[in-house]
Design a protein with these regions (language model features):
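Walker B catalytic acidic pair
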Residues: 148-149
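Conserved nucleic-acid-binding Ia/Ib motif block in the N-terminal RecA-like helicase ATPase lobe
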Residues: 69-111
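Conserved pre-motif I regulatory segment
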Residues: 1-32
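Conserved helix/coil segment N-terminal to the catalytic DExD/H
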Residues: 98-117, 122-141
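Inter-lobe connector of SF1/SF2 helicase motors
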Residues: 244, 248-280
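Walker A/P-loop
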Residues: 27-46
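Conserved P-loop NTPase motor "coupling/switch" region that bridges the ATPase
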Residues: 57-58, 78, 83-88, 143-144, ...
Length: 280
């Protein structure tokens, strides 16, 4: 599978083509790209290619609740080629008859030739209810599962993290998308990479991972003793271990990006807003 005959809906920048070529048919991959570098476009082109080569029939996108409308209304319509027929369904905790009918169509009916796209907010994975519906979707599809803004699953103790990690093996392809640098919060990587595969970083537990890369000091507070993280170590080793399944790009590396455009927008303030503004 290659990009030679693939027809984009929106023309990619060079860094997007490079990233797509690198991640194209990989079962698991991490896109560590700064905000503004078009992670969603890369992901949707990747899904389109896999669908056209009959590798997937479903796409599950997990995203913060505030981002779901952007995926639903903007990103999918903008970047997914029009030639690809799709059904898009956004998770609703309170199911209407219309929603239930649309969901059943996805998981029960023959949808050959149609890419089923299920958008679920990451917060919903704290509930068993959402997990059951997602599990059914994954079981009934050859699926790509994506966690957008994957730092939302950085806490290994959180219910959402545990549930997503448990569901992950049901997906044929897995992706995480985030823009944070390793040096800023290296311990946050553990759960995100564990979602992709438990074996990626070579540690059987978060505590073993922390012992390797965190510098700690024993502290006491009353009768309570604990290990306080005071710094980090071996970060070059950690970055090296990520190279086989990820790509890291910053805006300064992407020379073909257009220049920033600043637009002035003037708004009329209400009397209440003018009063508040005057007190600043």
């Amino acid at each position: 599978m290659n990009l030679q005959n693939y027809e984009y809906k929106t023309e990619p920048y060079q860094h997007q083509t490079d990233t797509l070529e690198l991640s194209l048919d990989s079962p698991l991959f991490a896109l560590f790209l700064e905000m503004g570098l078009g992670k969603s476009k890369i992901l949707l082109d990747n899904a389109a290619l896999l669908f056209e080569h009959q590798k997937i029939s479903g796409l599950l996108i997990v995203s913060p609740k505030g981002n779901l409308p952007n995926w639903d209304v903007h990103e999918i319509n903008k970047h997914l080629p029009d030639r690809i027929q799709r059904n898009v369904l956004v998770w609703q905790p309170n199911h209407t008859q219309r929603w239930t009918t649309a969901y059943k169509k996805m998981v029960e009916e023959d949808s050959t030739g149609v890419l089923n796209i299920f958008l679920v907010n990451v917060e919903a994975f704290a509930t068993v209810k959402a997990c059951k519906f997602v599990e059914e979707f994954l079981v009934t599809h050859d699926a790509m599962m994506v966690v957008d803004e994957s730092t939302t699953i950085k806490n290994p103790k959180a219910k959402r993290t545990k549930h997503l990690i448990k569901l992950a093996p049901l997906a044929d392809y897995r992706r995480i998308l985030t823009g944070f640098p390793v040096t800023k919060a290296p311990l946050d990587l553990y759960s995100q990479c564990y979602f992709l595969s438990p074996n990626l970083l070579g540690f059987s537990s978060f505590f073993a991972f922390r012992a390797r890369y965190a510098i700690t000091q024993s502290r006491t507070m009353g009768r309570l003793s604990f290990q306080q993280i005071t710094g980090f170590q071996r970060l070059e080793e950690l970055q090296e271990s990520l190279k086989d399944f990820s790509i890291r790009k910053t805006k300064t590396e992407c020379l073909d990006l257009p220049a920033k455009v600043y637009i002035k927008r003037y708004v009329e303030l209400s009397d209440e807003q003018k009063t508040a503004y005057g007190t600043m």
